[in-house]
């Protein structure tokens, strides 16, 4: 349902007033923007045909930017601008002129003209449009109130080197993830870069002689590389109503680590607990936690850790005493199908949809096996494997999000055939996880068993038992929310963008499983990828189940903590690489005006004005799932 049109309590001023001009006592009112009804969001798969431009862009963009960065440093011209003539010079680096022509057809040299190749520090000057939500809401009387802590998602936090072994020295205190230094290292010193990014397979910690740590401060996650913003628009809009470093924190972390290792190596959860307690004391206000993607899993784990005896030792009322609200943005609380593909073969939609020349170039530089080998050492990535079994994700003949599909089921996460002449075997999520274990080494299997659980608790007694088991804390289908009747939870995510739901696999000539990109059906399956509605990373099922059903039950929400669900339609601008201010894609939603309105309302103490709103078919989907007994 759509919310009412914006209403304001006073006439809009042309200029932003200062805090002296506008009394804090003024009570603001603001209605969130209207959105189309559910009927306007149908036929998601057909929309994917509107433009082929974006199919390969994300992955190719990373590759071409890296090649440009490597070439720049190789020639040593600090003032180089990548005009077409210059681009032609490094086309040979790809080993295929056809590949380069393919990539070049998508990218203009203007993409690179403002790239600050001599610095890692991005421009931080916000434009008026980027902070308009904050400026308008400041004019309407909204002010900073509760301290705010932001918990970024997977790969969002920059990682910088603190090592002094031979190849590390040139990169000391430079980011090997999340900067132009990363791209330089990837292309000019790939082996050194891999040695830093990969973790020890047995311990899940740093390899000997390597020390890579999460960058700190707002710069850790505001931009990935220059021009590619992540949290910057949220930070800017919060600042517009009075937030600054004394009442706002970006709690960056090393997303490669398992959650137990985050505490063991970095004392991440201990430091997060201390900052929350400090904020309560100094500001005499509870904290608002804002998380995105994997950050929502980290936050949920923190809720269990902080109250547990022998861990955070906060006691059973700590969350209720210290947390005002939890804003869960596009949270991967029950995992994502694309994690299976990333760990199984080092692939996902962006790589599967490259043409043969692009695949050749990518494989020549950074092969599937190398990518899979790297991510399998990262316990944090494995935390996003799907949870809930066939009850949640379905089987070969049924899935809760099949809805009106009659000849095809989303329940087969993997459809696998050894060679082109055979039929595909269909694997549900449990089979797919076993298939993954069959092709990985013992260290990976031990890491999974030690840190994570993927089941579903059927009784309250089972939930209470699981609450005492750290390996279960990652899974909201096996453990419960803390007893926090005063805390409010807001679940916000995008809908209306084709998203990975399953995969067709075959074997390559070396006998390794790879996505079978030859499979297409013209509607739902593209290059071996089964697509469904979602935000481009997480399908609707993963985005909406926990907040709309799991946390609506006493078993998983014993204090009846308030849950507000708000969906935002993905409405990308046609000629904007990031989709523009109406994009609700998994990352781009952080710049969406409606999301920023919600964040400012909640943090300023007006979260009660945020309504529930549904655009997708999530209510129909969750009605197909029975959490009280296993399927026959």
Curated annotation (Swiss-Prot):
Lumenal compartment segments: 78-632
GO biological process assignments: diacylglycerol metabolic process; lipid droplet formation; lipid storage; triglyceride biosynthetic process
EC class of the enzyme, as a word: transferase
Q: Where in the cell is it found?
A: Endoplasmic reticulum membrane
Q: Which GO terms describe its molecular function?
A: O-acyltransferase activity; phospholipid:diacylglycerol acyltransferase activity
Question: So where does substrate get bound?
Answer: 136, 294
Biological role stated in the UniProt entry: Catalyzes triacylglycerol (TAG) formation by an acyl-CoA independent pathway. The enzyme specifically transfers acyl groups from the sn-2 position of a phospholipid to diacylglycerol (DAG), thus forming an sn-1-lysophospholipid. Plays a major role in triacylglycerol formation at log phase. Involved in lipid particle synthesis from the endoplasmic reticulum, promoting localized TAG production at discrete ER subdomains.
| Entry keyword NADP | no
- Composition bias of kind Basic residues appears in 1-15
Q: In which pathway does it act?
A: Glycerolipid metabolism; triacylglycerol biosynthesis
Enzyme Commission identifier(s) = 2.3.1.158
Q: What is its main location?
A: endoplasmic reticulum
Q: Provide the alphabetized UniProt keywords.
A: Acyltransferase, Endoplasmic reticulum, Membrane, Signal-anchor, Transferase, Transmembrane, Transmembrane helix
What is the scientific name of the source organism? Schizosaccharomyces pombe (strain 972 / ATCC 24843)
Descriptive protein name:
Phospholipid:diacylglycerol acyltransferase
Active site (catalytic residues): 293 (acyl-ester intermediate), 535 (charge relay system), 586 (charge relay system)
Family of the protein in this entry: Belongs to the AB hydrolase superfamily. Lipase family.
| Topology within the bilayer | Single-pass type II membrane protein
């Amino acid at each position: 349902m759509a919310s009412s049109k914006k209403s304001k309590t006073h006439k809009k001023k042309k200029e932003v007033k200062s805090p002296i001009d506008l009394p804090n006592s003024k009570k603001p009112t603001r209605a969130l923007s209207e959105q189309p009804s559910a009927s306007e969001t149908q036929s998601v798969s057909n929309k994917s045909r509107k433009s082929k431009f974006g199919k390969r862009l994300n992955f190719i963009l990373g590759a071409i930017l890296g090649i440009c960065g490597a070439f720049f440093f190789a020639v040593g011209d600090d003032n180089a601008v990548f005009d077409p003539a210059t681009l032609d010079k490094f086309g040979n680096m790809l080993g295929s002129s056809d590949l380069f022509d393919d990539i070049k057809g998508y990218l203009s040299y203007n993409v690179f003209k403002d790239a600050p190749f001599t610095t890692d520090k991005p421009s931080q000057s916000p434009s008026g449009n980027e902070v308009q939500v904050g400026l308008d809401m400041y004019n309407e009387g909204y002010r900073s109130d509760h301290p705010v802590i932001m918990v970024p998602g997977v790969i969002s936090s920059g990682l910088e080197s603190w090592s002094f072994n031979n190849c590390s020295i040139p990169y000391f205190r430079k980011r090997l993830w999340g900067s132009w230094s990363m791209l330089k290292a990837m292309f000019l010193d790939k082996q050194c870069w891999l040695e830093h990014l990969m973790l020890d397979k047995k311990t899940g910690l740093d390899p000997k002689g390597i020390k890579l740590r999460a960058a700190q401060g707002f710069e850790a996650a505001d931009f990935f590389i220059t021009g590619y913003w992540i949290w910057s628009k949220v930070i800017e809009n919060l600042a517009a109503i009075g937030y600054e470093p004394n009442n706002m924190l970006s709690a960056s972390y090393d997303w490669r680590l398992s959650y137990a290792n985050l505490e063991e190596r970095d004392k991440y959860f201990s430091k997060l607990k201390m900052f929350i307690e400090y904020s309560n004391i100094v500001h005499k206000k509870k904290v608002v936690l804002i998380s995105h993607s994997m950050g929502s899993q980290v936050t949920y784990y923190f809720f269990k850790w902080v109250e547990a005896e022998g861990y955070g030792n906060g006691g059973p009322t700590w969350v209720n005493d210290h947390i005002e609200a939890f804003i869960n943005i596009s949270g991967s609380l029950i995992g994502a199908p694309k994690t299976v593909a990333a760990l199984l073969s080092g692939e996902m939609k962006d790589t599967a949809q490259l043409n043969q020349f692009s695949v050749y170039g990518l494989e020549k530089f950074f092969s599937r096996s190398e990518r899979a080998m790297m991510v399998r050492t990262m316990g944090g990535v494995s935390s996003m494997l799907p949870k809930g079994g066939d009850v949640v994700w379905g089987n070969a003949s049924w899935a809760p999000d099949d809805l009106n599909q009659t000849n095809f089921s989303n329940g087969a996460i993997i459809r696998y055939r050894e060679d082109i002449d055979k039929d595909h075997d269909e694997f549900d999520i449990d089979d797919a996880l076993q298939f993954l274990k069959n092709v990985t080494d013992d260290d990976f299997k031990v890491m999974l068993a030690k840190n994570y659980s993927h089941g579903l608790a059927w009784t309250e007694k089972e939930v209470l038992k699981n609450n005492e088991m750290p390996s279960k804390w990652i899974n909201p289908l096996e453990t419960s929310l803390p007893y926090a009747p005063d805390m409010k939870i807001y679940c916000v995510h995008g809908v209306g963008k084709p998203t990975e739901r399953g995969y067709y696999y075959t074997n390559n000539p070396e006998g390794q499983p790879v996505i079978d990109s030859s499979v297409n059906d013209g509607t739902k399956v593209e290059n071996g990828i089964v697509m469904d509605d979602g935000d481009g990373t997480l399908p609707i099922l993963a985005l909406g189940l926990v907040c709309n059903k799991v946390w609506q039950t006493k078993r998983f929400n014993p204090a009846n903590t308030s849950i507000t669900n708000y969906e935002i339609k993905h409405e990308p601008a046609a000629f904007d690489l990031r989709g523009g201010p109406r994009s609700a894609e998994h990352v781009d939603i952080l710049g969406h005006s409606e999301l920023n309105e919600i964040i400012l309302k909640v943090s300023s103490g007006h979260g009660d004005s945020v309504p529930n709103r549904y655009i997708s078919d999530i209510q129909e989907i969750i009605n197909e799932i029975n959490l009280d007994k296993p399927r026959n």
